[in-house]
Amino acid sequence: MTDSVIYSMLELPTATQAQNDYGPQQKSSSSRPSCSCLVAIALGLLTAVLLSVLLYQWILCQGSNYSTCASCPSCPDRWMKYGNHCYYFSVEEKDWNSSLEFCLARDSHLLVITDNQEMSLLQVFLSEAFCWIGLRNNSGWRWEDGSPLNFSRISSNSFVQTCGAINKNGLQASSCEVPLHWVCKKCPFADQALF
């Protein structure tokens, strides 16, 4: 027996021939996305993050009625924003006139309450301790803006109690020389009227 070697030539189709014969070639899962696809994804993610931050800021500063956030540009630090006004609740105590001077020095005024809704809101933030507000008895109880007290009553037990104060339970008359906390009120922007 002789050893004989048989050679055979195999002709395998090329990739383009196989694609033509069997339809479109499917990309394998290991193929890389193109550079432009990566850039588009990165820009989309960046846009989503920026929109989320903007939405968060809007909700924090505008969406709620009151806020103590430092990022709200319309009120100074340590002032609380509610509606269209900023409120400052003091931590120290002064007499009524010194409290008024403190507020005026900050382009604000002692609190003038415009309605029961505002009064109810502010009482949530107050304790048993009384705070000076912009209310005085000069031939009748009047706010610092000149308007009369007409939506609430004020408790008084002496004719020397001519300045108004507020705590979580309501309005109270007090002697103007008593040192109390105070509440200032101002518009968020300096170019608006104080009252």
UniProtKB/Swiss-Prot annotation:
Protein's UniProt name: Killer cell lectin-like receptor subfamily G member 1
Domain note: Contains 1 copy of a cytoplasmic motif that is referred to as the immunoreceptor tyrosine-based inhibitor motif (ITIM). This motif is involved in modulation of cellular responses. Upon phosphorylation of ITIM motif KLRG1 associates with the two phosphatases PTPN11 and INPP5D.
UniProt cross-references to Pfam families, sorted A to Z: Lectin_C
PROSITE patterns, sorted: C_TYPE_LECTIN_2
Location relative to the cell: Cell membrane
Cleavable signal peptide: none
Disulfide links within the chain: C75-C86, C103-C184, C163-C176
Organism of derivation: Homo sapiens
Gene Ontology biological process terms, A to Z: cell surface receptor signaling pathway; cellular defense response; inflammatory response; innate immune response
Residues annotated as glycosylated: N65, N97, N137, N150
